[in-house]
Amino acid sequence: MIEKLKSVEEKFENINAQLCDPDVVSDIEKYKTLMQEAKHLTPVVEKYREYKKVNADFEEAQALLDEGGLDKDFREMVQEQFEQSRDDLEKIKEELKILLLPRDP
């Protein structure tokens, strides 16, 4: 799933770059097609970027917990962040699965 999301994000970035090209802007049909595709990809890319941020938070919390040597209060705070990030990741993964489903024609 992650490879698919990386591919979608790359495609989105490519489309956005094309939309800035004066040749594309002057070709109304191509511009319209690219805008529609960008509109379709935007929710997937936004959710994927959210996933990457939450995953980084999760990994950071996990690394801190694995290090040990944390005082009790800080460890509790990191543990809460770890659990919240883990729960958020599961939710985001489910949302991404839905967003990646083929759309109806």
Regions picked out by a protein language model, each given a short descriptive name:
Residues M1-P105:
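Charged, heptad-repeat coiled-coil alpha-helices that serve as long linker/dimerization "arms"
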